[in-house]
Amino acid sequence: MMKTLSPTVITLPWRPDAAEHYFAPVNHLPWAMLLHSGDAIHPYNRFDILVADPVTTLTTRAQETTVCTARTTTVTLDDPLHVLQTQLEALPFHPQPDPDLPFQGGALGLFGYDLGRRFEILPDTAARDIALPDMAIGLYDWALIVDHQKQVVSLISYHDADARYRWLTSQRAPTRTPFRLTSAWQSNMTRCEYGEKFRQVQAWLHSGDCYQVNLSQRFQASYEGDEWQAFERLNRANRAPFSAFLRLHDGAILSLSPERFIQLENGHIQTRPIKGTLPRLNDPQADRQQAQKLANSMKDRAENLMIVDLMRNDIGRVAVPGSVKVPELFVVEPFPAVHHLVSTITARLPDSLHATDLLRAAFPGGSITGAPKVRAMEIIDELEPQRRNAWCGSIGYLSFCGKMDTSITIRTVTATQGQLYCSAGGGIVADSNEEAEYQETFDKVNRILHPLEN
């Protein structure tokens, strides 16, 4: 089959809220997805990406991946990322990379935390009480790209771009009940239970069984109404550069993530793990001192360095030998609710490997598991009452042009069957303080739980 070199691009009138303007009428459609830069004051705030109406969908639940097109539905037990690579390569689109068009059609969606069970042997202790898929990916032959840096709105399509624009502007969202919580947030563990789990982790750490474990608690509330309204509210409150709204058949994912997982561009790999958190303070001088306190914290630096080493090892499994570098170590980045300690790891991917090979080697991200990764994941499955599902997985895209960019789905709400789920955790190391770690879980989600209560 002839390869199509590039999509047709039409430029639409600029408006800074173009992503919300065009997404609102389609947000109710299954497989409508929005990657939003959150209007963040952040280096990675340039693009918003909107898709809907995919040509193919891939849905993984446990061992089965279901591939649906307009004509066929097939079920396979193959490695889900291999299935994804095969489906991408089967489509006749192979554009050249364009720095102004990061996503030129391709795969976009959710890689849930529990997809990691396909790549590592893990226990089956935690309850699977959320019915959403482990992987939910659409393949799209069009997209809307909002470039906030150049103030350009581009609609790209491999077919009739004008017809796609007419389709997009003809959509009308149904009238929805306004969003509201119908119960208070409830944790899946008491303060006493958290303490017991914390001390179990400490025992494993002091015995040398592991070096760091990310222990979380999950908050749940019932709700009614429009999840898109909830996302708009959260987006204004959090302004996170890797935000996303995914509409699935049986629910929605509302992500306000500050963290990049892996980017691949022209063979260059970048990952930016977050490890180390302190809450923002209202007084500017006290807030600057808080940032300096985080920068100087030996505990947080040690915690961060463990994950840097883990990510170097994960990426090194597939990178060109000798190419793994750490250009940034222990950088403090401010966000609306918290200061984070961030490091950057870079490498090169051999031409012989695909973005899915890189994703498989590093999934799930080390910043939300611990070290060593597999042992930490075993402990997480034993101590956390329920599976993580979408939380601590990844949301992102693999473009037909070869570029990949993905987030870590922290600060993320799962909405399904009238219930909201939102988790928060922290990396526990040998000298962690129980009360400080417990409080950190609240510091991380206050900007999510409270806006939804109002």
UniProtKB/Swiss-Prot annotation:
<dbReference type="InterPro" id="IPR019999">
    <property type="entry name" value="Anth_synth_I-like"/>
</dbReference>
<dbReference type="InterPro" id="IPR005801">
    <property type="entry name" value="ADC_synthase"/>
</dbReference>
<comment type="similarity">
    <text>Belongs to the anthranilate synthase component I family.</text>
</comment>
<dbReference type="InterPro" id="IPR005802">
    <property type="entry name" value="ADC_synth_comp_1"/>
</dbReference>
<dbReference type="GO" id="GO:0046654">
    <property type="term" value="P:tetrahydrofolate biosynthetic process"/>
</dbReference>
<dbReference type="Pfam" id="PF00425">
    <property type="entry name" value="Chorismate_bind"/>
</dbReference>
<dbReference type="Pfam" id="PF04715">
    <property type="entry name" value="Anth_synt_I_N"/>
</dbReference>
<keyword id="KW-0460">Magnesium</keyword>
<feature type="active site" description="N6-(4-deoxychorismate)-lysine intermediate">
    <location>
        <position position="275"/>
    </location>
</feature>
<feature type="binding site">
    <location>
        <position position="37"/>
    </location>
    <ligand>
        <name>L-tryptophan</name>
    </ligand>
</feature>
<comment type="pathway">
    <text>Cofactor biosynthesis; tetrahydrofolate biosynthesis; 4-aminobenzoate from chorismate: step 1/2.</text>
</comment>
<feature type="active site" description="Proton donor">
    <location>
        <position position="259"/>
    </location>
</feature>
<comment type="subunit">
    <text>Monomer. Heterodimer consisting of two non-identical subunits: a glutamine amidotransferase subunit (PabA) and a aminodeoxychorismate synthase subunit (PabB).</text>
</comment>
<keyword id="KW-0289">Folate biosynthesis</keyword>
<comment type="function">
    <text>Part of a heterodimeric complex that catalyzes the two-step biosynthesis of 4-amino-4-deoxychorismate (ADC), a precursor of p-aminobenzoate (PABA) and tetrahydrofolate. In the first step, a glutamine amidotransferase (PabA) generates ammonia as a substrate that, along with chorismate, is used in the second step, catalyzed by aminodeoxychorismate synthase (PabB) to produce ADC.</text>
</comment>
<feature type="binding site">
    <location>
        <begin position="241"/>
        <end position="243"/>
    </location>
    <ligand>
        <name>L-tryptophan</name>
    </ligand>
</feature>
<dbReference type="InterPro" id="IPR015890">
    <property type="entry name" value="Chorismate_C"/>
</dbReference>
<dbReference type="InterPro" id="IPR006805">
    <property type="entry name" value="Anth_synth_I_N"/>
</dbReference>
<dbReference type="GO" id="GO:0000287">
    <property type="term" value="F:magnesium ion binding"/>
</dbReference>
<dbReference type="GO" id="GO:0046820">
    <property type="term" value="F:4-amino-4-deoxychorismate synthase activity"/>
</dbReference>
<protein>
    <recommendedName>
        <fullName>Aminodeoxychorismate synthase component 1</fullName>
        <ecNumber>2.6.1.85</ecNumber>
    </recommendedName>
</protein>
<dbReference type="GO" id="GO:0000162">
    <property type="term" value="P:L-tryptophan biosynthetic process"/>
</dbReference>
<feature type="binding site">
    <location>
        <begin position="44"/>
        <end position="47"/>
    </location>
    <ligand>
        <name>L-tryptophan</name>
    </ligand>
</feature>
<dbReference type="GO" id="GO:0046656">
    <property type="term" value="P:folic acid biosynthetic process"/>
</dbReference>
<keyword id="KW-0808">Transferase</keyword>
